[in-house]
Amino acid sequence: MTTLRFTLPLPPNRANARWHWREEARLRAQWLTTARFAVSASGIKLLRKPMERATVRATFYLWSKQDQDNLFARLKWPLDALTQKHWGFIKDDSPDVLRFGWMPEQRIDRKNQRLELELTEGWMVWVEGNL
């Protein structure tokens, strides 16, 4: 069973944003470029074939705690980036392919804000003793 761990730059909070579509496209392209460099620098190799089914765990390191809906909104760009269209780690980000094993976690780290994703091949459910 393959497990990949990504440390990505913190994506902007999109939940309450009302960006013009051009501004959002610019920010998204900028974030994708920065995130791609982070993945390359980490030494994670591309897979020969995208995962058909995967479970993701997300841990946010933030300035201050946020509502859960804001965390899910922040996951949009990173999960899109994992797909075959961009980086090719998962076939798609639809519920038939990608599931959450746990609610996104959040921790306070004001000096090093980031998003850590753990992508595991297959569908898993983490339980309290298995963290």
Name these PLM-found stretches:
Residues 1-131:
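Catalytic phosphate/metal-binding cores of nucleic-acid and nucleotide-processing enzymes, i.e., regions
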